[in-house]
Amino acid sequence: MKDKEFTQASSTKGSEELLLWKGFSVYLFDEDINRDYVGGFLDELTKSDAHTATHIFLDVIEKIREGKGLQAEMLKGKKPKIKKVEQGDKLYELREYSSKLRKHLRVYFSIDSNNKKVVFLNACFKSDDTRQDKDIKLAISRYKKYLHKQK
């Protein structure tokens, strides 16, 4: 698949593991005009569940930002942490659960392979299917705006 950038990397134990999006940078949609949708959601989440917000920020966003990539296992299994969204071409959803709030969270992002960026588009609490479809459409719309700005 073209949208998944797999890279071989040695871990500290010397074994090889597949990493997703190694060497990519992070772009938080519209943070350059002070509309950081994902960062704002995580800031609000920190007030009620700092552990989950910190986990998303440090274990996902910061690892990509530092160029380390994410483990390919996050896309595998019955309940993958990262799932490709069917409606979007290169759209993924990061799935987390806040045990403190007893709510599922979704962080939507796309992969810009040309510019080697992971573009974080939207973050929200999961609700009914209708609301989730709207959240996905919003993420797709934001990614199209991002691509238009890149031209």
Where in the sequence are the language-model features?
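Short glycine-rich, acidic/polar surface loops and turns
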Residues: 104-110
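Basic, Lys/Arg-enriched alpha-helical interface segments
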Residues: 1-103, 114-115, 125-151
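Active-site beta-strand-loop-beta-strand hairpin of nuclease catalytic cores
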Residues: 111-120
